[in-house]
Structure formats: C-alpha cells, structure tokens
C-alpha cells in the first residue's frame, strides 16, 4: 500500500503556517491523517484491498481494487469511516480540555462540514451515491451525480467570490474539487466500457 501527499497540500500548508504558525499546520495535518485512518479501518473491516492513500486538503482518497464490486453496505461504511473518525476526535476535544482544544474543535467541524456536503468526491457524496445508485444503471446514476456536483461547485464558487479575500482558501478547494469532477466526467465512458466487458464476461 502506497502513501503520498497531494502536491496541492504544499501551498495550503504554507498559507496555514504563515497565518497560524506551526501549531495550526500540525493540527490540520494530524486531523487529516486521523480522518483518513477512519476510512482505512472501514476498508479493512470490509475486506477491501487498499492500493494507495493520498492525503488531500479535504481529507484523503483511497484507491481500492474493485471498489464498485463491493456491496452497497460496504461502500457506505467506507464513505462514513472518515467522518466517524473526525466526529470522535471532535467529541474528545469537546469533553477534554487541553492546550489547543478549541483549535482542534474548529478544525474538526470544518472538516466535517466540508466532507459531508452531498457532492462528489466528498464523503457525503460518496455515501449518497452508495445509497442511491442502481447496478443496472450505475453509469447513468454516476454521470447525473457528477453533473450535479459540478453545478453545485460552480454556484458555490460564484457565491464565495463575493467574500474575497477571506474566502480565498475555500475557493481554491472548490476549484480543485470541480476540476476533479470534470476529469472524472471526461473519462466516464471508459468506465462504461469496463462495466460492459465485465458484464459480458459474467454472462
């Protein structure tokens, strides 16, 4: 299993280090690792083979072999593993007072609020897709959800632009997510070909 940091983290961490010092840097990075550990535990509990983990500004991304072949329940638990871990860390910060506990609380709340948005590729979107997509129309369900996610992000970016410069970091994150979805949307036809080949091999 490979572990890597996405290059987009560098400017984010530089900005955090300049604005909040090394403490903010450490809390954010530690929180993202803990969040991703929740996904990893969920993947292992459901016997999923994790090929790699990439840490991103909003959490992380697990590359899982044959992800779509797992049950709806397994994919739902995988999506919720990170938010559950973040919620546990939030509860600890709320009940145990320690230096920086308020900063930990704020960061966990931000990670939760962002990750539970009902759009791809965030955890909220992954969970909703796992609940609603149908095996016989998976390609069309995912395409519709991708288009919804792109539209949601475009509207969100337009709203956030009115709050510059305070919203610069959120705008950067929204643009990154939008570009991710556009990239997936462009290559979705190859996923359809793969699913058709797999279906033909089973019949």
Regions found by a protein language model. Name each.
Residues 1-203:
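Hydrophobic transmembrane alpha-helices and their immediate loop junctions
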């Amino acid at each position: 299993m490979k572990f890597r940091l996405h290059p987009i983290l560098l400017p984010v961490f530089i900005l955090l280090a300049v604005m909040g010092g090394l403490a903010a840097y450490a809390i954010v990075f530690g929180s993202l690792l803990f969040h991703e550990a929740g996904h990893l535990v969920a993947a292992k509990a459901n016997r999923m083979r994790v090929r790699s983990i990439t840490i991103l500004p909003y959490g992380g991304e697990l590359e899982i072999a044959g992800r779509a072949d797992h049950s709806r329940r397994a994919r739902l638990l995988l999506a919720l593993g990170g938010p559950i871990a973040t919620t546990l860390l939030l509860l600890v910060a709320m009940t145990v007072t320690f230096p920086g506990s308020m900063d930990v609380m704020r960061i966990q709340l931000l990670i939760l609020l962002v990750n539970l948005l009902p759009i791809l590729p965030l955890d909220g979107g992954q969970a909703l897709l796992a609940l609603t997509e149908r095996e016989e129309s998976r390609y069309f369900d995912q395409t519709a959800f991708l288009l919804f996610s792109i539209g949601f992000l475009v509207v969100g970016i337009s709203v956030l632009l009115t709050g510059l410069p305070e919203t610069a970091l959120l705008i950067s994150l929204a643009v990154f997510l939008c570009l991710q979805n556009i990239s997936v949307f462009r290559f979705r036809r190859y996923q359809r070909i793969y699913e058709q080949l797999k279906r033909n091999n089973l019949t």
